[in-house]
Amino acid sequence: MSETSPNNLTESADITEITQLILRERESRDLARWETMRECFWPDSLIRVSWFRGNGPDFVTGSIEMARRGIPAKHRLAPILVRLAGDRAIASLHGIIDLPVVLKGIRATLSTHSRFLYRAEKREGAWGLMGFDAIYMRDELTPDLPGQVITISPEETKDFRRSYRLLSYYLHSQGYKVDSNLPGEDVPETVDVLYRELFGWCGIPIPK
């Protein structure tokens, strides 16, 4: 039996509930269903992404403000893998964050490829999210109209990490402070540190 195969009906039900919890949280973010999104997080959860670090409820408040400012992120999600350990679990999936942007006067879509890692915990019989982290892989910028070109010089992005360089560049232009020490494939040791933290919290070995 593999580490991710459920051993009984209870584990299968837990995995299904966690999967639906994550999908509900991301759908609520995309569709501005803010109270539903808020209900997905435990109050003492920890969220660490490019533009935000804090608890889940405050993350929702920040997302509301981001949407109000005209930065409506949408998410493309791959299948979710849940690793269960009693009342705790880690879920991972590949995700692409799409942001409609205007840069240098040209409308485009900024797409950031990441691996999302969620921590979930069951309390009083219900699962809630305890954490959300992203491992940044790469990003890309696609103008809305074929043939248009957005020119960004190396000098403009020299202070930003390669794995989320364009995202950092855009968020910085919108007044956001971006953490330059987040987990990313361009600095493998940052990924190793995150995996040790999350899998240690869950009490299960890191996959090999």
Give residue ranges: language-model regions.
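Short, aromatic-enriched amphipathic alpha-helices that serve as compact interaction elements
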Residues: 14-30
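Terminal "cap-and-tail" regions of soluble proteins that handle hydrophobic small molecules
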Residues: 2-19, 126-208
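Short, glycine/acidic-rich beta->alpha junctions
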Residues: 17, 74, 110-113
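A solvent-exposed, acidic/Ser-Thr-rich amphipathic alpha-helical stretch
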Residues: 34-99, 198
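Charge-dense, low-complexity intrinsically disordered segments
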Residues: 8, 12, 50, 107
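Exposed beta-sheet edge and beta->alpha loop/turn motif
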Residues: 88-124, 138-160
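Hydrophobic/aromatic beta-strand elements that line small-molecule binding cavities or substrate pockets
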Residues: 77-82, 115-121, 134-135
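Conserved catalytic-core segments centered on acid/base and nucleophilic motifs
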Residues: 27-28, 40, 118-121
